[in-house]
Amino acid sequence: IETVGKNDAPVRDVRVGITWTGVWGKRCGLGRTYASPATAHATVKGFGKLTEMTTLELARYARSWHLVEAAIGVAAINSMIKPKGERGLNALDFLIREGKNKKITVVGAFPRLPELREVSKELWVLELDPNLVNPSEGILPATAAEHKIPRSDLVAITGSAIVNKSLEHLLELSKNAYTLVLGPSTPMSDVLFDYGADMLAGVDVLKPAQIMMKISQGGGMVSPKNCKGEIEFVVMEK
């Protein structure tokens, strides 16, 4: 958090959508919204006054175990990072190309998993939602991480794992594999390389007003394909 503090700015807007949370300060950052019926009764600290704060103050929410607050915190961190790296690259293309005949673990449900399954030697998908677990399809509960990740050649971890505090542990389990952290929640900071990531694949929000409006109106997948000219993929390698 402190490494990005030099880019602190007044908060212009905060949106908590059903899929994504956005914070707009100097730049616009995103974080995955993990909401449940239980969080409906747990009020976000400072609600109604978040735009009177700075992005660094909101970034400290990332430490919260109230996961809606944590999403606001991660989005605030991302709003203080100007993404570096190659633009316009889709990390899933890299994963499919490099995953041929490899043992792969994917943490989180990503698009194009059937393509990845076709080229890989073995593919395990770790899923937090118990309703989506299907062992016959290789979709396992997240608790299988200890068993599957250390056996993998390639590991792809959703950047949303930083919101629920599992990212550091997942990177530790992945120390013998080539590891990607990807998705809009991913902080594009080389600090993550110190924790074991080999590639970061996040986004740069080019048009904050449009993206903030879309995520607050139920926007799900945010990508250059369905938010043309408003968001861009960025990839950075160790």
Language model feature labels by segment:
Residues S120-P135:
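NAD(P)-binding Rossmann-fold cofactor-contacting core
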Residues N90-L95, G138-P150:
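Short acidic low-complexity segments
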Residues G99, L116-V119, I149-P150, L171-N176:
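Short, conserved loop/helix-junction motifs that constitute active-site signature segments
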Residues F110, D129, S185:
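Residues in the short beta-alpha loop(s) of Rossmann-like NAD(P)-binding domains
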Residues L180-K238:
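C-terminal functional extensions of proteins
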Residues L123, K165-P184:
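A short, gly/pro- and small-residue-rich
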Residues I1-E118, I215, E232-K238:
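Electropositive, gly/pro-rich neighborhoods at or near active sites that engage anionic ligands
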Residues T105, L154-T158, L180:
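Structural motif
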